[in-house]
Amino acid sequence: EVPFTQVRIQDAFWSPRIETNRTVSIPSAFRECEKNGRFDNFAIAGGLKEGEHRGDFSFDDTDPYKIIEGASYSLAVKYDARLDAYLDSVIALIAAAQESDGYLTTCVTNRCTRLSGWWGTHRWEKINSHELYNSGHLYEAAVAHYRATGKRSLLDVAIKNADLVCRVFGPDEGQKHVPSGHPIVEM
């Protein structure tokens, strides 16, 4: 088994596409997060900014997570100091949004009532809330970021959230005995 970080692709087909992903696609995806309020939602949840929660879905938090995952894998293949610093700034917003017990879903923390059809009136109330889906993408991003950089900043956020999930869900008395509603947290 060869770790992908030890593979160097140097051909006329994939190399330009990988470079385009690093220099165009990833920055464009992050700009969309900025434009559409994804980062603002974390800043609001973390008390760093005032304002209304933006977006149309309870799972909008996954957009930054998925892009962090891809950007981290890109960093692992070709280091980019600017991208690394940008990831640090985004991760700081995510960490600020995490509640003290590890909970992290911005539309719930921000009490976005117009999305309450998705999440209800309190944590873990509705199966279609996508809270665990959000967590699953957080975990994948955190692992990718840690593998790429060795930094624990997002990994520590993910572990704190996973510890909460393990306390809340399970077979024991007092725990929730429900499916996740959308696969990914179990990965």
What is each stretch, according to the model?
Residues 1-187:
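Glycan-recognition and catalytic cores of secretory/periplasmic carbohydrate-active enzymes
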